[in-house]
């Protein structure tokens, strides 16, 4: 069996946007991992919001915006209410202008639309406000198209990423963002460059994304996030050196006390993990004709170095141990690889789910012609995971077909609350599949919309029953329905991916058994037999040599916490060569 070689594009997962699929291709759900949460709104602190009313090109080659003429008396009265910050009354009056009740011209209707969105923002109906600002951002001819960019940035501090404000920021260009490059609004300028970079990244415009991320200054609270996306953008264009440099800048900034970071230890570990994955990906080259892998030992060693920097208390530590096991395997360091797997399968981590670790263990035994041991590992693997796979698929069958996203979302909430009627053998697997940060942000978005709906229902009855009140209620209902559908769809894809990967690992186990049978009959493919380890080689690669800081202590069947991560297993080759 030829081991699957992961590349950085496959394994780096920073809870990032899923790049948009190429034309004719379906989008693939992004894995869950660890992008930093949406920043909290900043306090005023003397910052000035400059309203930029002067005209400029919109960058889209569109015709000039409409011009507002003389306001009707009703529109002027609505604007006065707005200026007096009587947001409730202003919203109702402005909505009448927008709907044409007052007979105002298109230009004044657009002005009223803009002021209506601001009024709703001030009333803390952020989703309803965003719905209107979205309409404005979609129309470069709108008289307040440019000014809306400021409010999109404000909304991004109130609504989480699943609201997809980044998509609306993507309607703007460098020149329009550059208008905020002044002493009073530089924080906004950095934030908008980060958001526009995210838009370019999701649309696979990686070089453009990198250029925009590099405009985010070290003083910005978005700096660390911008550097993460700089790194993974370089990974996407297969430039490992600048990718690693971006991740190193994150660690340097954290060491220097950069602002705007809530969980420094987690981000430091994530940066180490990302560097390890990048080095590992670039260390292995596979010949397209022979499918034989060649390894750059320097880069592979660098990958191991950064995996070892992930703290044992980190949520990423087990991931680092498992991924490092493949690197040790590629380097021929089987004692290290098997030792890591021994840690992963210890009783200290009863809820961990690394079925591929058993596959790797069997591959190592097979490579050393220990066919009986390899067969035993595969048999134990099948005995444990085949029933789990069957149960996972049984649940999945209940959510096949159309319009199953909302029912699965309800199932997701039940599981997170400790319910869901799950067998205890699969509960931790399902919980892990449905607990990544991107999915949790979608759940938080639904909760936020429900909280906004509660605020709306506590608003004055006159507002609720007004035409704008009905629009606010409708906007919240639509947004919640879409958010639930999106969260359910994402959860389904996470669950399906776990099932698909487990099926793949079970098939890999069967392939190993086939190769074992062929080897025992001396019919093994030459490519596979050339990859096996001779007895002489096993004396080099299969023994355990402690350094001056460590001693060998035989394992007696009892695990100790302080030994986790330090296990080694002697491997003796049974190959005849």
Q: Which stretches of residues belong to each language-model region?
A:
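"A position-specific structural signal for the A-helix of alpha-solenoid helical repeats
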Residues: 76, 115, 151, 188-195, ...
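Short solvent-exposed coil/turn linkers within tandem alpha-helical repeat scaffolds
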Residues: 65, 98-109, 133-147, 162, ...
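TPR-repeat structural position
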Residues: 87, 126, 162, 206, ...
């Amino acid at each position: 069996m030829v081991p699957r070689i992961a590349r950085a594009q496959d394994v780096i997962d920073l809870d990032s946007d899923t790049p948009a699929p190429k034309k004719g291709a379906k989008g693939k759900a992004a894995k869950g991992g660890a992008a930093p949460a949406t920043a909290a709104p900043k306090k005023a602190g003397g910052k000035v919001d400059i309203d930029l009313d002067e005209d400029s090109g919109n960058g889209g080659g569109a015709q000039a915006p409409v011009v507002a003429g003389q306001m009707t008396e009703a529109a002027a009265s609505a604007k006065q209410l707005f200026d007096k910050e009587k947001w409730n009354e202003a919203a109702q009056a402005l909505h009448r202008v927008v709907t044409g009740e007052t007979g105002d011209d298109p230009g004044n209707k657009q002005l009223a639309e803009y002021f209506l969105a601001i009024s709703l923002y001030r009333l803390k109906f952020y989703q309803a406000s965003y719905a209107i600002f979205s309409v404005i951002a979609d129309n470069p001819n709108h008289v307040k198209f440019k000014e809306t960019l400021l409010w999109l940035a404000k909304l991004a501090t109130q609504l989480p990423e699943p609201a997809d404000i980044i998509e609306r920021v993507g309607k703007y260009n460098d020149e329009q963002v550059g208008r905020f490059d002044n002493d009073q609004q530089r924080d906004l300028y950095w934030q908008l460059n980060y958001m526009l970079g995210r838009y370019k990244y999701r649309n696979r415009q990686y070089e453009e994304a990198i250029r925009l991320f590099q405009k985010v200054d070290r003083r910005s609270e978005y700096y660390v996030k911008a550097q993460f996306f700089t790194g993974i953008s370089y990974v996407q264009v297969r430039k490992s050196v600048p990718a690693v440099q971006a991740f190193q800048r994150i660690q340097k900034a954290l060491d220097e006390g950069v602002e705007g970071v809530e969980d420094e230890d987690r981000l430091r570990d994530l940066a180490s993990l990302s560097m390890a994955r990048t080095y590992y990906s670039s260390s292995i080259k596979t010949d397209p004709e022979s499918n034989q892998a060649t390894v750059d030992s320097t880069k592979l060693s660098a990958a191991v170095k950064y995996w070892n920097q992930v703290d044992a208390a980190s949520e990423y530590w087990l991931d680092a141990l498992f991924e490092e096991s493949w690197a040790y395997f590629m380097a021929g360091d089987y004692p290290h690889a098997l030792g890591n797997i021994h840690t992963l399968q210890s009783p200290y981590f009863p809820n961990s789910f690394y079925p591929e670790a058993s596959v790797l263990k069997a591959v190592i035994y097979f490579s050393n012609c220990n066919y009986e041991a390899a067969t035993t590992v595969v048999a134990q693997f099948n005995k444990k995971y085949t029933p789990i796979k069957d149960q996972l698929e049984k649940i999945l069958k209940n959510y096949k077909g159309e319009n199953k996203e909302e029912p699965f979302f309800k199932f997701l909430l039940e599981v997170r609350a400790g319910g869901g009627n799950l067998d205890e053998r699969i509960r931790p697997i399902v919980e892990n599949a449905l607990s990544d940060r991107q999915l949790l942000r979608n759940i938080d978005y639904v909760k936020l919309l429900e909280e906004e709906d509660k605020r709306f229902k506590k608003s004055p009855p006159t507002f609720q029953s007004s035409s704008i009140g009905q629009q606010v209620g409708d906007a919240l209902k639509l947004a919640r329905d879409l958010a639930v559908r999106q969260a359910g769809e994402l959860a389904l894809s996470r669950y399906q991916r776990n099932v698909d990967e487990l099926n793949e690992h079970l098939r890999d186990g069967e392939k190993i058994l086939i190769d074992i049978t062929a080897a025992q009959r001396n019919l093994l493919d030459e490519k596979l037999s050339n990859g096996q380890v001779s007895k002489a080689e096993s004396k080099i690669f299969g023994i355990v040599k402690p350094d001056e800081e460590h001693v060998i202590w035989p394992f007696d069947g009892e695990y100790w916490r302080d030994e986790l991560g330090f296990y080694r297993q002697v491997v003796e080759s049974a190959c005849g060569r």
